Every structure is written in C-alpha cells, then in structure tokens.
Amino acid sequence: MARMQESADLLKCSFCGKSQKQVKKLIAGGAVYICDECIELCNEIIEEELGQAQHDEQERNELPKPSEISAFLDTYVIGQDPAKRILSVAVYNHYKRLRASETIGRRRNDEPETELVKSNILMLGPTGSGKTFLAQTLAKLLDVPFAIADATSLTEAGYVGEDVENILLKLLQAADFDVERAQRGIIYIDEVDKISRKSENPSITRDVSGEGVQQALLKILEGTVAAIPPQGGRKHPNQDFIQLDTTNILFIVAGAFSGLEKVIADRNGKKGLGFGVEVSSKKEEADIVDIFKDVRPEDLVKFGLIPEFIGRLPVVATVSNLDQKSLVKVLTEPRNSLVKQYQRLFEMDDAVLTFTDDALEEIANQALERKTGARGLRAIMEEILVPIMYDLPDREDVGEVIINGAVARGEAEPEMLEAVAEEKTA
C-alpha cells in the first residue's frame, strides 16, 4: 500500500513538473503526463493566437468602399471616370454578396434570406482605352486571382480551337491551383464583340466561333461546377479533373464593338438611309461613348450577341478614346507610368532621362495617328529609346539624356550631357 502511494507521488506533469497531489487532474498519454493547469494555459495561448490570426485575416480582407476602389484606380489609370464609378460599385457589390453568402452559411437559417444574384460586367470601348488595365488593377487591389482570355481563340466544344474550360484553367493557374481562391477570382474575356453571330436571326449552320461560343460561355457566366483538365487541352475519359464552381467568379467581358454606334443611332433615328445623307468618315464628329451610354439589350442583339448571353451581363460600363492630353498624362502620371519606368532603367546605368513637353506631345500624337491608344505608347517609346539604351552602358561620360520633340519625330539625335566626375566615381 505504501509503495502504491509512493508511485502516485512520483507521477508528475511532463510540462510544469508538478506532482499528481499538487494538481486537480493529471492526464496520461503514452509515457507523458499533462495536468489540468497546463491544459488551461494551452487553451489560453491557442485562443489568443487564433484571435490575432482572425483579426489579421479580417484586416487583410477588409473590403474597400467604392470611393476607395475608384481612388486606387486613379493612381494607375488616367481618365475614364464614369467607367471607374460603375466598375467600383459593381465590384464592391459582388464581393459584398460573397461575404453575405458566407455569413448566412455560418449562422442558423431561421428565415429565408434574399438571394443576391451575381452581376457580371460588359465593357464597351475602343482598343487601347484601358479596358484590360482597369480589370487588372481591380484584381490587384482586391488581391484575387486574375486571368485574361481572348474570345477569338475560343470554339464550341468538339471543334478545333480552345474550349471555354481552358479559361478556368488559366484562373486556376493564377491561383496556384488553390480552388477556393480561384472560385473568388476575376476572369477578363477580351474581344467578345468578335464572337457575335453573323446575322440577327439564329443560324441554320454551325457557327462554332460565334454563337456557339456564346452558348458555351453561358453556363460558366451564370454559375456551374466545371470539370477542368489540369494539363489543359481536350477532355479525355480517363484523365483526372479539378472541380471548379464558377458561381462566385466575377466575369468582365469587353470589346470595341465597332459598328454598334450605328445600330444605336439607327434606333434613335439620328441617321437616315438613301441619297442626301451626310456620311462622315471621322469618328470624332460623333461622341461614340455618349452613344454607347444609351445602349440597350436589343441593340446588342442586333449587333450579334444572343439574348441569353446579354442577360448574364447586366452591368455595362463604357470607356472612351484617349485624347492627346490624356495620353500625355498616361505617360507621366500613373504610379507605374512608362516615363517613370524608363527613367528607372536609365538610373541603373547612372544616367538621368528627361522628356521635354513637346516630346511627350509628339509621342501621344503618334499613338493617335496609329489608332493604338495607350496600348501603343510603349512601342513608340521603345523605337525612340532602344538606340540610346544600346550605347548607354558603354558611355560612362553620359550623365543625362534629353529627349525633345525633334528626337521623338526621328529628326534629331538626343542631347547627351556629360556626367559630373564626382557622381560617376561615387
């Protein structure tokens, strides 16, 4: 009996060292013991750390307000204020809807909740006006996976080309195959106007790259569980698939919709047909963006989109052509503007790059002449700067390079100022 009492006294908590007599409870697990006091302490530590982690996660996932979203877009994208407002509200409502559905899922369902339906976005506007960049910047702010697809590369299932499921694969790849993250991402489909059907009436023959693609996109736009082949390509019966629910993926589809303004103008009776009608070849004579703001579903149907496809794109945002003044701002003002990027490259070679006002205006004018908008600015900058950047690493005597209007037009060589000896040696 004394020996049993002695062995009980020898049992101690493996963590704090207290004996069985000094604590209320001693729990055995294999060759170790833990007392009730250590268990309580562990629970407090876990609760504290989990609480901090949840707080950090909440701060990280704080949903920005529409005004904050628009202000963030302003730091990267010049102009397009009406489109920014529409996109900011649409994106805010979309992710607010996701949070609401998660909250409803966590609490008791005592009464039926109002169902919030997803609102995908249609963007109308000319090439080089910033449609893609707006979508990319939104994804950057929200820290969600983002994928870009070209509608012209898509074909209906069973035909040569790219299946619509490959769009979802791109999103999965952007999310490092994290399905949960991918299901909250953004997919941008460009050139959607190029998949309009060939006539307003339903086609008798197969239109595999037009109406057929629109039909294939319907399900993923609305929400479906798609089977995605991890390696891409066509589906085979024996391969493994990743199941991806598209219900909460935000789709932004965009296109130039050249010719849609005529459809809208005809509906409004602004133009007639026949002799005596003044025909203008200059788009500048009519504010196309203002006309696009009056777009109605029947106009898009006449253009070649099927009604079911239009119905999945309730939010419409229009972007305008950038004028010379706006293009100059694109070159200089955004946080990652082209001028700032090239100036940084020159700094790495211990030189200062300076553009005069007339040089910036000339670059903007060339982009307007080429009808490439902001998208063509980098190519023009490269044409001007590549010869200089080729020689600069070998020119230790150069401290500053000045680009003026004549240089931008190709009529003169850039002015190169000598480097200060102290700066180069430093």
From Swiss-Prot:
The protein, known as: ATP-dependent Clp protease ATP-binding subunit ClpX
Lineage: Bacteria, Bacillati, Actinomycetota, Actinomycetes, Mycobacteriales
PROSITE patterns noted in UniProt: CLPX_ZB (PS51902)
Biological process according to GO: cell division; proteolysis involved in protein catabolic process
Binding partners and assembly: Component of the ClpX-ClpP complex. Forms a hexameric ring that, in the presence of ATP, binds to fourteen ClpP subunits assembled into a disk-like structure with a central cavity, resembling the structure of eukaryotic proteasomes.
Highest taxon listed in the record's lineage: Bacteria
SUPFAM superfamilies assigned to the protein according to its UniProt record, in alphabetical order: Glucocorticoid receptor-like (DNA-binding domain), P-loop containing nucleoside triphosphate hydrolases
Binding residues for Zn(2+): C13, C16, C35, C38
Sequence similarity: Belongs to the ClpX chaperone family.
Keywords: ATP-binding, Chaperone, Metal-binding, Nucleotide-binding, Zinc
Chain's gene name: clpX
UniProt keyword annotation of Plastid present: no
HAMAP family given in the database record: ClpX
Coiled coil: none
Gene3D superfamilies in the record: 1.10.8.60, ClpX chaperone, C4-type zinc finger domain, P-loop containing nucleotide triphosphate hydrolases
Pfam family membership, one: zf-C4_ClpX
Residues bound to ATP: P126, T127, G128, S129, G130, K131, T132, F133
CDD domains hit by this protein: RecA-like_ClpX
Family matches, as PANTHER family: ATP-DEPENDENT CLP PROTEASE ATP-BINDING SUBUNIT CLPX-LIKE, MITOCHONDRIAL, ATP-DEPENDENT CLP PROTEASE ATP-BINDING SUBUNIT CLPX-LIKE, MITOCHONDRIAL-RELATED
Any one GO cellular component localisation term in the record: HslUV protease complex
Annotated ranges, domain ClpX-type ZB: 1-54
GO molecular function, one term: ATP binding
